[in-house]
């Protein structure tokens, strides 16, 4: 028997392009039905739908040809999954576009119905009867406001319930002077501020306890700088309401052995009455020496200890018989690598001695 002839290998990309050209020459276009379109947009939508259908048929035929080629030649089957994936993506896009066009076409058909010559309302429109009811309710509410300007809640309730006539109700919200004073007092009086572990408010009657509490606050502020309230101290000339409570601690620090001044000013809580309960203001000036570790100034050596170079991008330090000396960058790197090699050689010799 004779030998089986081997099939020639085809280039899949070139074959696909040639197939596309052949199909483009004689495409199987769908027959569009003759229809009297009522608008240009409706005609455009129908044309787009028919072109989508013809493109979908072309993709199906192209995929069928590629499958046949992959079955005949195994080398072409390597690119088949990628091609089928691309076909699937394009078909999904066509389906989404066709669905949107069909939805738009349905909306146009609803607007131009064949039964009546009048245009139908769109889906999002509101009923006219409901609009008239709301307008009547709003007009009645405005009329009730013009007659009885106090009964605002009644007018708003009539507008919400959409009634034709306003109801004569006498339930109105009135505010008396006592309630106003209570509200003002409750709004202006502030709660005592607690700091640290202390849970009791500041006692207004005893001044000794207040001074002790202030000293404790100063000690806590020295230990924790995050809790410091950096507000300026109160001035005697400033006019502030008696109900306000301000607690400010001004703290200034400088570097070096310089004394720091800490000023604490506290104004206690008072009521809104004209008779002010005792207000005490204490100012303690505490001076203490602050010890701040400053970075020593950078000193540049005169020259290198080995090569006597005066300028180098980076100065290094080494030891010569226990004495610290200044080295330039090149000399420092040289002796550092040399010391590293000597250390590694000593380690190797020690390992050999242990093994032997």
Swiss-Prot record:
Keywords from the UniProt entry: Coiled coil, Metal-binding, Zinc, Zinc-finger
Bias-annotated ranges (Acidic residues): 206-228
Family annotation (Pfam families): GATA
Coiled-coil intervals: 91-119
GATA-type zinc-finger residues: 304-331
Span list, region Disordered: 158-294
GO molecular function: DNA-binding transcription factor activity, RNA polymerase II-specific; RNA polymerase II cis-regulatory region sequence-specific DNA binding; zinc ion binding
GO biological process per UniProt: negative regulation of transcription by RNA polymerase II; positive regulation of transcription by RNA polymerase II
Alphabetized SMART domains for the sequence: ZnF_GATA
Biased composition (Low complexity): 158-188, 260-284
GO cellular component annotations of the record: nucleus
Protein name as catalogued: GATA zinc finger domain-containing protein 17
């Amino acid at each position: 028997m004779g030998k089986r002839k081997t099939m020639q290998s085809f280039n899949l990309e070139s074959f696909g392009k040639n197939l596309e050209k052949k199909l483009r020459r004689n495409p199987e276009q769908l027959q569009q039905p003759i229809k009297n379109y009522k608008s240009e947009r409706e005609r455009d939508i129908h044309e787009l739908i028919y072109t989508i259908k013809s493109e979908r048929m072309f993709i199906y035929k192209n995929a069928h040809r590629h499958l046949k080629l992959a079955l005949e030649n195994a080398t072409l089957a390597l690119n088949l999954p990628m091609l089928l994936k691309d076909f699937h993506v394009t078909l999904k896009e066509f389906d989404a576009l066709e669905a949107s066009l069909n939805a738009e076409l349905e909306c146009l058909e609803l607007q131009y119905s064949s039964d009546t010559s009048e245009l139908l309302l769109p889906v999002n429109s509101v009923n006219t009867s409901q609009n008239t009811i709301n307008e009547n309710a709003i007009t009645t509410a405005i009329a009730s406001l013009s007659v009885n300007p106090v009964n605002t809640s009644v007018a708003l309730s009539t507008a919400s319930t959409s009634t034709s006539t306003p109801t004569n109700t006498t339930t109105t919200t009135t505010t008396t002077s006592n309630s106003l004073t209570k509200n003002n007092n409750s709004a202006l009086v502030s709660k005592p501020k607690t700091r640290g572990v202390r849970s009791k408010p500041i006692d207004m009657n005893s001044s000794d306890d207040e001074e002790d509490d202030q000293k404790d606050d100063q000690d806590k502020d020295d230990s924790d700088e995050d809790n410091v309230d950096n507000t300026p101290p109160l001035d005697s000339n400033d006019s502030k309401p008696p109900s306000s409570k301000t607690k400010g601690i001004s703290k200034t620090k400088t570097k070096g052995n310089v004394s720091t001044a800490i000023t604490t000013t506290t104004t206690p809580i008072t009521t809104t009455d004209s008779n002010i309960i005792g207000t005490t203001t204490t100012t303690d000036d505490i001076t203490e020496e602050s010890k701040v570790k400053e970075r020593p100034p950078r000193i540049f050596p005169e020259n290198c200890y080995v090569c006597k170079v005066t300028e180098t991008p980076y100065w290094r330090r080494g030891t010569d018989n226990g004495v610290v000396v200044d080295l330039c960058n090149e000399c420092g790197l040289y002796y550092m690598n040399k010391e590293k090699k000597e250390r590694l050689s000593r380690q190797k010799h020690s390992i050999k001695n242990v093994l032997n």
